[in-house]
A protein has these predicted regions:
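Mature catalytic domains of secreted/periplasmic carbohydrate-active enzymes
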Residues: 1-350
Length: 350
C-alpha cells in the first residue's frame, strides 16, 4: 500500500507508550513473540520494505507506562539510570539485528524535561556508532537532524517532516464507521503534500491498522488515488529544491490558487493549480526570466504561453481532466529563473 501510494520510506511503531515490543526482544519479554501473534513484526516489516525499495524508520517511544521506572526516573537517579539502560538496550537490539536502518524516530520524552536527564547526547552518539548513516528526529530533547511538527503542518527553517494522522483524531485503529466522517480525501492529502514540498519538508502520514493488521478501507482508496496522481506528477514532489536557497524571496505554500515547487537548478517551476481559471487563461507574475517552454506535467502536452513586458507569464488553454484533482504545469527556463517578491508583483491572476 505504501509503495502504491508513492511513499519513499516507512516508520514502524516498534514500541509505543504501553511498552509492547513488536520484535523478538531479549530485553523486554512483553513482546510480539511471547504474546498475541507470536511473530517478529519488525522483521516482517523490514523485509517488506527492502523488497519494495522503501527506506526504513523505527519509531521508539521514550515514555513507557509499563516499566516500573518509567515514572520514577524523573525523581530517583538510580531508577533513571536503570530506565535509560533499558531504553538503550531496546534500541541497540533494533539497530543491530535488522541491517541498515535509515531513521530513528523518538517520541514523548516524558517525564524528564531535559536532554541531560535523558542522557540523549551520549546515547545518540552510541546508537549512531551502530548505524553511521542514520538520521534522528528532535524528540529526545535535542535538535538532532530534523524537526517534527505534529498535527499541523508548520514550516521550519531546518530539515523537517510534518507528522500527521490519517483522520486527524486517532493515531491507532478507529473503527471505520466512526473514522469515515474524518477520513482524508485524495485532494486533502495532496494539499498537505504540496505544502510540505513547497516549503522543503517531508510528509509522514500515519495510518492506524485494523486489529488484523490490514489497512482500513477508508484509507486505501484515497492513498491509491494519490499514488496514481504521483505516477504522473511526482516530478513536482520528489527531491525538489529547498525554498531557503532563494533567501526568503519565494512565497511559501501558495496563495490559495496555486502552490509552487521548483527544480534543483532553478531552471523549472512546477505550478500546482488548485483553482481552474474560467476561460482557461491564467497569469503568473513577478518572473524576471523569460520561459522557453510550458507543459502539463501529467500528459507532457505543450501549453500555449506568452511572456509580457511587465514580467508576467500568460498561460492559455488550461483545463482539468475528470478525476485529475490538481493539474501541475511545468514552466522551463534556459537559465536559473529570477523572481521578485509577491508584495511587489501579485503572483496569480485568473
Amino acid at each position: 500500500m505504501a509503495k502504491a501510494a508513492g511513499m519513499k520510506y516507512m516508520v514502524l511503531t516498534t514500541r509505543h507508550h504501553e511498552g509492547f515490543s513488536l520484535w523478538d526482544s531479549k530485553v523486554n519479554p512483553f513482546n510480539s513473540m511471547n504474546y498475541g501473534c507470536h511473530r517478529d513484526i519488525v522483521r516482517e516489516f523490514v523485509d517488506a520494505c527492502r523488497k519494495e525499495g522503501l527506506g526504513i524508520g523505527f519509531y521508539s517511544s521514550l515514555m513507557d507506562w509499563r516499566h516500573p521506572d518509567g515514572a520514577r526516573c524523573a525523581y530517583d537517579d538510580q531508577a533513571r539510570r536503570r530506565f535509560l539502560d533499558y531504553l538503550e538496550a531496546l534500541n541497540t537490539e533494533l539497530l543491530t539485528n535488522y541491517g541498515k536502518i535509515d531513521i530513528l524516530w523518538y517520541d514523548v520524552p516524558q517525564p524528564m524535561e531535559s536532554w541531560e536527564g535523558w542522557d540523549s547526547l551520549a546515547r545518540n552518539q552510541r546508537l549512531r556508532a551502530l548505524q553511521p548513516d542514520i538520521i534522528i528526529n528532535d524528540r529526545s530533547r535535542l535538535k538532532e537532524d530534523f524537526g517534527t511538527p505534529e498535527g499541523k503542518i508548520r514550516v521550519m527553517d531546518r530539515d523537517w517532516e510534518a507528522c500527521m494522522t490519517f483522520n486527524d483524531i486517532a493515531w491507532g485503529y478507529l473503527d471505520e464507521q466512526q473514522a469515515l466522517p474524518y477520513a482524508y480525501s485524495a485532494q486533502r492529502i495532496l494539499r498537505m503534500l504540496n505544502t510540505c514540498a513547497c516549503n522543503g519538508g517531508n510528509l509522514l502520514l500515519n495510518v492506524g491498522p485494523k486489529p488484523d493488521g490490514s489497512i482500513p478501507a477508508d484509507a486505501i482508496k484515497p492513498l491509491t488515488e494519490v499514488g496514481k496522481w504521483l505516477e504522473k506528477n511526482g516530478e513536482a514532489v520528489y527531491g525538489q529544491l529547498h525554498p531557503n536557497i532563494l533567501s526568503g524571496s519565494w512565497f511559501r505554500g501558495g496563495n490559495g490558487i496555486s502552490g509552487i515547487t521548483y527544480g534543483k537548478d532553478l531552471k523549472c517551476v512546477y505550478l500546482w493549480n488548485w483553482i481552474s481559471p474560467e476561460g482557461g487563461t491564467m497569469y503568473y507574475s513577478g518572473v524576471f526570466t523569460e520561459p522557453v517552454r510550458v507543459t502539463k506535467l501529467s500528459t507532457g502536452e505543450d501549453i500555449e504561453f506568452r511572456y509580457t513586458e511587465d514580467h508576467r507569464i500568460e498561460l492559455k488553454g488550461l483545463h482539468v481532466e475528470e478525476g485529475e484533482f490538481v493539474p501541475v504545469y511545468k514552466i522551463e527556463f534556459a537559465e536559473p529563473m529570477e523572481y521578485k517578491p509577491f508584495h511587489k508583483y501579485p503572483q496569480i491572476w485568473l
